[in-house]
């Protein structure tokens, strides 16, 4: 499968609507809203397209103190396990990451395992701390979680790679 990885600031309403559709299918309703995909000067969104359709995205936030947060990475279910998430991160590290910056991300831990664990490990990020159920008070209130049964059962695992 040939995937075009495009670095762009998403500004067209149609593009944002497509990215919201990807987000909703993965993370549930209202997890991301329209303004989430409108980048500020300290944010970067890298998108993956296949045949002119958005199939994935990576959002990076450049924080103070040489710290970078992988805020979210999402790939449409039909396109998962095809290297798209790896290519999004590879594109970021090759074109935008400074070795003086540390980088971190939160991964969901559900009964089926830690989502994105292998992906983050591929980029030398280590699971350093279980932060517990940090989404518990927002789950099915601020957004409709696709993993929630009777109660929130997701935990946040902090993955981190220090600067060199």
Regions found by a protein language model. Give the residues of each.
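Conserved active-site alpha-helix within GNAT-family acetyltransferase domains
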Residues: 109-144
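Short loop/turn motifs at secondary-structure junctions and domain boundaries
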Residues: 36-42
